[in-house]
């Protein structure tokens, strides 16, 4: 019985959360500007990291980009953000980058 209770608690934490709410989206936009921008440039046009503008990412898949966000890129300075972001957060950021034009 204790095992079943533990399993139910663990599964409850893995339920599909869905897209981030408006407040979390604001936090993620801030993270993109501050944290991603520190390497990819304030306009995401490149710096230490490669450009991540919508134009530079054209043709990339949301799932592929979210995997890079979560797991980083071995052999580069790109860290994995899995300890801080959910998969839904990473997909939202990937979609945001693919659709947002920088000025």
Curated annotation (Swiss-Prot):
Name the record gives this protein: Cytochrome c55X
Gene Ontology terms: cellular component: periplasmic space
Places the protein is found: Periplasm
Keyword Iron in annotation: yes
UniProt xrefs under PROSITE patterns: CYTC (PS51007)
Source species: Paracoccus denitrificans (strain Pd 1222)
Gene Ontology terms, MF aspect: electron transfer activity; heme binding; metal ion binding
Entry comment on modification after translation: Binds 1 heme c group covalently per subunit.
Binding site for heme c: 36, 39-40
């Amino acid at each position: 019985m204790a095992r079943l209770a533990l399993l139910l608690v663990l599964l409850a934490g893995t339920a599909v959360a869905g897209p981030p709410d408006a407040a979390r989206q604001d936090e993620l936009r801030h993270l993109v500007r501050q944290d991603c921008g520190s390497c990819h440039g304030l306009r995401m046009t490149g710096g230490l990291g490669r450009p991540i503008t919508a134009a530079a990412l054209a043709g990339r898949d949301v799932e592929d980009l979210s995997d890079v966000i979560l797991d980083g890129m071995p052999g580069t300075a790109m860290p994995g953000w899995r300890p801080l972001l959910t998969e839904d957060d990473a997909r939202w950021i990937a979609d945001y980058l693919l659709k947002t034009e920088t000025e």
